[in-house]
């Protein structure tokens, strides 16, 4: 296959990825967006395998089959409530893949056309170092995020003195190591960069509380994209550069939107200080309370005299798997002629779009699910705001 044909196919795949992002921006077109993404990835993989000299198609095919089987098994077994930790786990694999590709390019540069071992061009070394640095941070940060979301690690923020200063010093040390690596190409320095970057990834995520995990997941998504973009420059792969930049930019923009919605700074997210604030509670009552049980009909009966209801779901709804009961309540209210809508805060749940996924699973009509900017101005004219499992969003100081 000629290089011109490869460039055309890569460009076509990149366009399909852009269409996929466009489709995934709305629930009604999300299925079409997924199809665009799948077709684009298949074309990219086939083009790469036909253009590059592959040592063994059997090995590549076996790896694809094993990976596909594992992915299919996970997709069939995973519950909707566990999607955030699944996304975090996938991000960790992207970061780890970037590190492995960088290591392969460093130890066998001739296979990638960037020189020979010990005599790699400085520009390639810089690109390799940046991709490795971001990939290692993405890997360790995503592993810790997975642990927090899965409950393996405490979801509470872990804060200590001089945290930002320590993170900044580690970052400066990594930059210094990169300069050393570019100058002498030492394998020891290469692996030191990886280990220190992994440490920095942990330190960036540990001060972030569970309620703020959507921003973390989005930011790690951005990191994984930039890691892939950096490795794309090392491999001179235009498609990897384009797709990495798409993922990196979209993740960064989404993180900014969510941070702004919570009246917090995106800089705190990057530095690992997001969600570390703890509000003082005026009362501390740990005594057992009586559980009041009810069903969708009971809740609808209380609200039936209202003309309009806005339902604000949060992570508590996901934990209780109450989305189906919530939809039943909404259906009952609509039969009474009540205007029912769902308000989705950008950081509700544990990942971007978490509430949208759960409400879609419960077959809530797409037109009733509105984002913050679309519905925020309607709250003063609405009789009832029904908050379910979203107290940390409506009042971040609540405990």
What name fits each language-model region?
Residues 287-399:
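Structured cytosolic domains appended to multi-pass membrane proteins
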Residues 246-306:
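Membrane-interfacial segments at transmembrane helix termini in multi-pass membrane proteins
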Residues 16-29, 68-87, 142-157, 200-213, ...:
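C-terminal ends of transmembrane helices
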Residues 1-14, 51-69, 124-139, 185-196:
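Structural signature of hydrophobic alpha-helical transmembrane segments
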Residues 209, 223-267:
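Mobile "lid/hinge" segments at catalytic clefts and subdomain interfaces of large enzymes
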Residues 48-61, 73-84, 99-117, 184:
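Transmembrane alpha-helix boundary signature
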Residues 31-40, 60-64, 82-94, 157-168, ...:
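Cytoplasmic-side transmembrane-helix entry/capping segments in multi-pass membrane proteins
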Residues 104-118, 182-188, 215, 222-242:
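Transmembrane helix-loop junctions at the membrane interface of multipass transporters and ion channels
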